[in-house]
């Protein structure tokens, strides 16, 4: 599976997992992140993650179900 690239702005050193879920359309609102993460498996660099505030940096790989994303 080829990960979809998520590009950070130059003034943005990271994004949170909750923001990633929202901008990719996996959830509709930021408030849904907590519930989504409690009920679904999300991997960050191959390890399970359930914190919506997890900071994602350049080079991180995220897998949500059959979807994959890379932070660039």
Feature roles, as predicted:
Residues 2-15:
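A detector for short, charged/polar N-terminal pre-domain segments
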Residues 15-55:
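A basic, amphipathic helix-loop patch mediating RNA/tRNA/ribosome contacts
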Residues 66-71:
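Short, charged beta-turn/beta-strand-edge "cap" motif at the junction between a beta-strand
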